[in-house]
Amino acid sequence: MPNGGTLEQAKEMEEMMLVELAWLWPVGILTLGSILAVVLAMVLPRGRQGLVGAWVAAAHLGAAVTAVEVWLNRGFTPVMEGVVMVDGLSLTLAALIGVSGALCVALAQPVVAGTDREGEFYALLSFASLSATLLGMAGDAALLALAVAALGLATFVMTGYSRESARSNEASVKYYIFGTVSGAAMAYGLSWWFGLAGSTSLESIGRAMAEAPELVVIASTALVLFGLGYKAALVPFHFWTPDAYDGAPLPVAAYLSVLPKLAGLVAIARVLPLALPGDAAGWSTAVAILAAATMTWGNLAALPQRNVVRLLAYSSIAQSGYLLMGVAALEHSDHGLPALVYYALAYAAMNLAAFGVVLAVQRERGSVDIDAFRGLGRAHPWWTVALGLAFLSLFGLPPLAGFVGKLEVFRAAIDADQAWLAVIAVVNTVISLYYYLRVIAAAVLDPAEPHETEVTTPAPSHAPLSAAVALTAAATVGFGVAAEPLFRLAERAIVLGG
């Protein structure tokens, strides 16, 4: 029989677990939502599979609300002995994933509605969001590896959702092969870290890396960055991006362009300062060079593109470079992390708005070539306004959210004595104006081809798509107009690890 002391200890442990679980409500809701989505997909008839999407969207919004509640009322703390880090950065990501995931469900509705695997698609999307949330919260190398693998598996299947499409199958295979290679490289790098520290805790790894040979530090960190850089579509880990976006269903491309990317960047922002404290091996300079290469390659490769999805793929690579500027500034500026958080919010809104309009044009005109956008302004002014807001915000036109986001990451770079990076970013921003304006000019100035079908008002079944575009376009404007209070909130995300 257990004695009284043992019972008291067990009771204390139980109470401690319950307290810790209260900080994990966003993860718990997404977990429950994912499991129930699988069950509903199995039991509901084909005509009712749309209910799975409604449930998944509700679970995402619930996770976002609880993330905000924890952020405002409970504070920040390591959970499960530091395996899970509940702090301003991870909770902001959880809220952003919740809202963005729900919007992606709305974008997917007109594409997957009535298909054989509609419920399965929504369940996969939910599991991918759960994995992305855990990736942003990982304070342990084991959880980091598990989240990367789970996220890769779910998004790989989503990319190949259109099994009858050869392009979708090709995109899925390329995504899988590159994901497998990058995952293996990351696992190898993490094994080095474990060998050095004798622990999977990132804090323990950081202490061990401070005493390790510099060559070992550089090599192992580069391997880990291979896996995380693949998620964020950073150069030179970006090669899968244009083919995957172009071959996948457009709602999946929209999802890939936002959620895994931001989760990967947040993981990099968490891992590097913990594992390489005090700018060990000059990691901030290395990340700054990576940011410069990423934005430059993305913008230059986007210039000749006529396929708007591939153009957005290269644009998203360039945007990763701008976002990475916030990470590069972390070690030498308190402005880096708030700038990253604010720009992530702006990027999610404007990129989802852009993909939403492209999806509408594809469904109405059967193409995503620039010529398909000709005459769009006359045929459907609403889509053109949303397209213009999204593309001009991606460029960085004031007072839109993208302008404020870029301004803040530029300030962070200058504050961190990386003015050269800010100059490169400004030059890249000017370059990007050309390809964004090409699409806008086709929609506003060019007449429609005689054989083209005019864009008509979306059918009632497309109401979720219209709502998603309206919300994201409004957020693109609103985040810019209300930039100051939003940035003050973003500054709370400088708290890492409690």
Kindly give the residue locations of the regions a language model identified.
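Alpha-helical transmembrane segments of multi-pass membrane proteins predominantly involved
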Residues: P2-G498
